């Protein structure tokens, strides 16, 4: 698909469905993959599945000291991060008028502020090497909004604006910054939806099915590869036509 042999990638949120799929696809293309997450058992299971060329980097992204240490450890243990995939994210849904400050704060902290801090840590070294790929996994919700998710949508829209600005700042250093925005993707969470709930979702998707983690991961692999060397500041939407942007 996209040749990544010898490239070193750090994938945050690799213990989740999309993050795990991204790690698998990058690894299959020859990359050495650093797996970040908070669910240690899932990370270890994924590492066992992948075999060699894998390193684990557990960290709590809500803790700024752990975020800084994550960047430093990944740089040291991987001997330089060539590909940074900011995929980790959380939700704390609720109607705006009932949303508590802590629910706003933690979503912005993990989804947006931790991404800023980790990217800053890694980018400093990418600039020194004059090479790098930064891919931020946002969401269709960041582009079109979603009731009950003002905090989540704000964080994901923020990632898109962040990526466009950073892309302009570091393009001359041979570093690209792009986003992948998934729509409804098959996961343990969507598996719990009943038939009526799934039917309602399908009406909004012209392709009439949910996407797979591998389809999202394939877009990430493209942006990480030399095939996308002339692509920066862009968002690839993987949503089955749910939002044609």
UniProtKB/Swiss-Prot annotation:
The active site is at residue 152. GO terms for biological process: fatty acid biosynthetic process. Substrate binds at residue 139. NAD(+) binds at residues 11-35. Keywords: NAD, Nodulation, Oxidoreductase, Plasmid. GO terms for molecular function: 3-oxoacyl-[acyl-carrier-protein] reductase (NADPH) activity; NAD binding. Proposed to modify Nod factor fatty acyl chain. Belongs to the short-chain dehydrogenases/reductases (SDR) family. NCBIfam families: 3oxo_ACP_reduc (TIGR01830), PRK12826.1-2 (NF009466), PRK12936.1 (NF009547). This is Nodulation protein G. It comes from Rhizobium meliloti (strain 1021) (Ensifer meliloti).
